[in-house]
Amino acid sequence: MKQTVYTASPESQQIHVWRLNTEGSLTLVQVVDVPGQVQPMVVSPDKRFLYVGVRPEFRVLAYRISPDDGALTFAAEAPLPGSPTHISTDRQGRFIFSGSYNAGSVSVTRLEDGIPVETVDIVEGLEGCHSANISPDNRTLWVPALKQDRICLFTLSDDGHLQAQNPAEVTTVEGAGPRHMVFHPNQQYAYVVNELNSSVDVWELHNPNGQIECIQTLDIMPADFADTRWAADIHITPDGRHLYACDRTSSLITVFSISEDGSVLAIEGFQPTETQPRGFNIDNSGKFLIAAGQKSHHIALYEIKGVQGLLEEKGRYAVGQGPMWVVVNAH
């Protein structure tokens, strides 16, 4: 399995393309100059395209991915109705979802053979919208509205329209600020990182009454932390054994172990990392984690070690200015 790491640096308007070597190092393959401040990125389900959100002219760019070395070639672009804070796709590669924090909206862009074509739906009134996350069954879009302490739930239709479900939302505690989320591989649980109180919520997707329920909340910060809380990102290993969340004020990555059924988290440790880690990701083998320091202008590569899933630094690499996003593609 070949793996490629992509890092987005909006201040220098660049994407750095890296080969992830099996022994735990990165080799630079390409530096792409992007026509705009590049922020969120996602790889298409079929691994053929990298989709990139840019501003100040709000667009999604599509780059073809070389199956040989992961290098990028520009393919197409389409306008977006708001500044893209987060982008993702449905699991069939038919639609792109773009969450916009500033616009308080989520939009749906139709794809034709991997190429973004047109906006087919937009939902507004989602204050502080920070991500859009399709459920494992590809039916429900989870959209955290950070400023409203709620996660809105929409049914995705075959033509890409979003219909509010009943109930239409789940709510966090006041002041939590739900931001990003991941699903457990068993499709029974979701984990949400809350920006404003630096916590992680465990959501049971189908409790005995058929409802969505928050069953655990954990503080991701050390007990003696007394500064402003500013959590950012969350990711899970492919085997569902370990979860990681980061906080930007402390520049820490918190390491969690996950119970066998996915219902319980336990903190295993705290990993100091690059300054102001806004984004990170885990490779497809579950062996490595790559974190981006928005203020250090570097990425750090870690090996995930042992039963606890603790992190061992393998190297750090200069990228562009203000790196914010990391994605990994297996090809």
Curated annotation (Swiss-Prot):
Catalytic reaction(s) noted: 6-phospho-D-glucono-1,5-lactone + H2O = 6-phospho-D-gluconate + H(+)
InterPro entries xref list: 6-phosphogluconolactonase_YbhE (IPR022528), Cycloisomerase_2 (IPR050282), Lactonase_7-beta_prop (IPR019405), N2O_reductase_N (IPR011045), WD40/YVTN_repeat-like_dom_sf (IPR015943)
GO aspect biological process, one term: glucose metabolic process
SUPFAM superfamilies with a match to the protein in the record: Nitrous oxide reductase, N-terminal domain (SSF50974)
Gene Ontology MF term list: 6-phosphogluconolactonase activity
One of the record's GO cellular component terms: cytosol
EC number, UniProt record: 3.1.1.31
Keyword terms, alphabetized: Carbohydrate metabolism, Glucose metabolism, Hydrolase
Function: Catalyzes the hydrolysis of 6-phosphogluconolactone to 6-phosphogluconate.
UniProt cross-references to PANTHER family, sorted A to Z: 6-PHOSPHOGLUCONOLACTONASE, 6-PHOSPHOGLUCONOLACTONASE-RELATED
Protein name: 6-phosphogluconolactonase
Gene coding for it: pgl
